[in-house]
Amino acid sequence: ANFILERHIAGVGCLHKHAVVDTPYGICFADHRQVSLIRGTELSELSLLIRDTYQGLDLEVNRGALALGYHPLINNLVVNYSYDAVVMYAYNFDTQSWAKFTSFNNSGKFQSQFEISDDQELQSFSTRTNKVESLFRSNSNDSASVLLLKTKRYDFGLPEKFKRFTKLH
């Protein structure tokens, strides 16, 4: 495959091959300083809102820690920056807000880029079990799941008006 460099943006880059993911909103990528989104020629920093909590990303790339994944069912960008996967961040594209999660599946040690399973769940390779495992179940009531978020979009007619009613469980 031949690649052509389209443009160079000074001070912004992709740190690792697992630090980039394609989303319906554009391409998301991460480096030591930030998580960014590029849409065509427009570049925006997504991580600006959570800088106060992490003071710059502390990425452990040599240990296979950094990974970005997009979860299509709940419209979230998941950022794993810790080798032990004790803390992850999720960016919700609908609300344009960040959430901090701890102890996904109580497993820890997830690495590699996330994959989408047949039932549209976000998965990653666990070094603890040496298997590909789901990080969380967005469509279950499993009490062991960390992220128990269900959404459903309702249409109330009037197609010319934008409206959304979301129910959280």
Q: Where are the regions that the model predicts?
A:
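Beta-sheet repeat architectures centered on beta-propellers
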Residues: G11-G26, D31-H169
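Surface-exposed extracellular loop regions of Gram-negative outer-membrane beta-barrel proteins
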Residues: A1-I9
